[in-house]
Amino acid sequence: NPLDNASDLVFYLTNAIDGSEAKSPSDQRHEKHHQAGDKREKNPSINPGGGELAWHSDLQYMPEPQVYSVLYGIEIPASGGETEWCNMTLAYAALDEESKREIEGLRSVNWLSRKLEPACHPVVRIHPATGARALYVSPGLSRYIEGWDEAEGRALIGRLAEHATQPAFCYRHQWQPGDVTMWDNRVTMHRRHGFDLAERRIVRRTQTVGEAVIAA
């Protein structure tokens, strides 16, 4: 298969774009019945189950979140399991001026697990190549707003996420075997829709190394 080595694909694509360094690929296996002795299946990052995964930007909980991600569909269920993206640049541009002033200079606190050191990132970030502003919060990883009451911060994150995930800003991909998708985590959020675990879903993933977030 020409995409068996997904790291080669992302290496060539991302270096053609901006010189980002690719990481090795990993399989995301979602199966009801797993091969005996395959310890990878117990890792939730590889097998997160069949439920819906919340909106997020990859590795937003790290000090230098990853830039590009690539998914390659190998085995796809008959229904469900779609991946959906939203455009955070368009979402920011569509905010009214009062909302833009409200979030200017704010920072969100992000974590995947309390066992890990949280990462603080600007709520509005600058894309280094285009200079465009984009929202950078997600309901899946952004926990509260630095310096705010926690409940009020969560409410703001929720409002921004609800705004950003309007259908006008979103694309939902219906997977077919052999499909390849690539996206820029600096200007998007994504989620996976749920599916029946009686069916197999195997998707290969690879990504580039991270970079520091530029505040607006």
Regions found by a protein language model. Name each.
Residues 1-180, 186-216:
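Non-heme Fe(II) oxygenase catalytic core, chiefly the N-lobe of the double-stranded beta-helix
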